[in-house]
Amino acid sequence: MVNVPKTRKTYCKGKACRKHTQHKVTQYKAGKASLFAQGKRRYDRKQSGFGGQTKQIFRKKAKTTKKVVLRLECLSCKTKAQLPLKRCKHFELGGEKKQKGQALQF
């Protein structure tokens, strides 16, 4: 279980700052895939018409988790940076801090 606070003071690479400032932390999420990317256009063109499936569909998935990527936004200059974490099954953003002698809850 990884619990990350919603704000963190860390170095900002923005041209305005270049020092340690307060950052807002959010979890990175992949955007919607574009229909007009070259690979997608090529794939759709190849798939159209007769002949069934033309490229392999990947089925041998090996990983059970994804790496968590944090998106840090500087509160003074709005510069955004990304910070990858290690793999984890449970990720929490701004959850309650652990108390001593308490049982784990999911």
UniProtKB/Swiss-Prot annotation:
GO cellular component: cytosolic large ribosomal subunit
InterPro entries assigned: Ribosomal_eL44, Ribosomal_LSU_eL42, Ribosomal_zn-bd
Any one GO BP annotation for this protein: translation
Alphabetically ordered keywords of this record: Ribonucleoprotein, Ribosomal protein
Keyword Oxidoreductase on entry: no
Organism lineage: Eukaryota, Fungi, Dikarya, Ascomycota, Saccharomycotina
Source organism: Eremothecium gossypii (strain ATCC 10895 / CBS 109.51 / FGSC 9923 / NRRL Y-1056) (Yeast)
Entry's family note: Belongs to the eukaryotic ribosomal protein eL42 family.
Protein name: Large ribosomal subunit protein eL42
PROSITE patterns for this protein: RIBOSOMAL_L44E
UniProt xrefs under Gene3D superfamilies: 3.10.450.80
Gene Ontology MF term list: structural constituent of ribosome
The encoding gene: RPL44
